[in-house]
Design a protein with these regions (language model features):
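A conserved active-site cap/scaffold subdomain adjacent to cofactor or substrate pockets
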Residues: 100-105, 109-166
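Aromatic- and glycine-enriched glycan-recognition loops and surfaces
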Residues: 10-14
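Short, contiguous pre-domain boundary segments
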Residues: 1-4
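A translation/RNA-centric and nucleic-acid-associated enzymatic feature enriched
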Residues: 17, 33-63, 67-75, 84-111, ...
Length: 233
């Protein structure tokens, strides 16, 4: 078997097994538009703008979706129940040895699930895909305590700028969430590269995005595989 054929079959099996996992839990597969009239509102992600024949629409300016989140949440609001989607997404300024302007994304929603139930769901998905590596779960704050001895949630803007400077890092930032993320990349991510699968949960409220805020933290998490962030919820 050629190397290309093997890769294609592996990809086919991966997608099929993901679908089987969600089908077995009565999660409905959906397809939503990838061509939208507005760009993403996420300040850290850039949409790709495209133009179409004006005869097809009132506007000639559209944007390729950076994720199916918005359209899927509209389905949820209409009472769809549990849903998932596997699709291509597009982001500008993402090309590199890790990121790409186009990639495949899995997006899913489980109605009534809290953050830790979603983590358990993903762990079950990984097991169904053949993963038997140990899994670590740790809060954002605890990770900073354990790996950098920093009280990240109770440190103010100036305090975190001083920490950046003490590590020889650029401190020219206007928002505390930017400093938090830079510190995470430089001080925490290198430490979790040795962990096969790591869930970081309870991010600072400044990084809530669309997540619910509970005190100083947002009820969201990310999953890292050997230091590479692959899941954001």
């Amino acid at each position: 078997m050629s190397n290309l054929k093997e890769k294609l079959l592996n990809h086919q099996n991966l997608i099929r097994n993901i679908r089987s996992f969600f089908y077995s839990r009565n999660v409905v597969e959906v397809v939503t538009p990838s061509l939208l009239t507005t760009p993403t509102t996420d300040v850290y992600i850039d949409s790709i703008e495209v133009s179409v024949n004006q005869a097809l629409s009132k506007s000639s300016k559209f944007y390729l979706h950076t994720s199916p989140e918005l359209e899927m949440k509209r389905l949820l609001a209409k009472g769809s129940g549990d849903i998932f989607q596997i699709c291509q997404v597009f982001r500008d300024n993402e090309h590199g040895h890790i990121n790409s302007n186009e990639f495949t994304m899995l997006e899913f929603y489980r109605v009534g699930f809290d953050m830790h139930q979603l983590i358990d769901d993903i762990k079950a998905l990984l097991i169904s895909l053949g993963n038997d590596d140990p899994v670590k779960e740790i809060s954002y704050a605890q990770a900073f305590y354990d790996y950098a001895e920093i009280d990240i949630l109770n440190s103010d803007f100036e305090g975190l700028k001083n920490i950046l400077e003490s590590h020889g890092l650029n401190s020219d930032y206007e928002w505390i969430e930017d400093i938090q993320m830079v510190l995470f990349v430089h001080l925490i991510e290198p430490k979790i590269k040795t962990i096969p699968v790591c869930f970081i949960y309870d991010f600072p409220k400044q990084q809530a995005a669309l997540a619910q805020i509970d005190g100083l933290v947002a009820n969201r998490f990310e999953m890292y595989i050997k230091g590479l962030s692959l899941i954001h919820i």
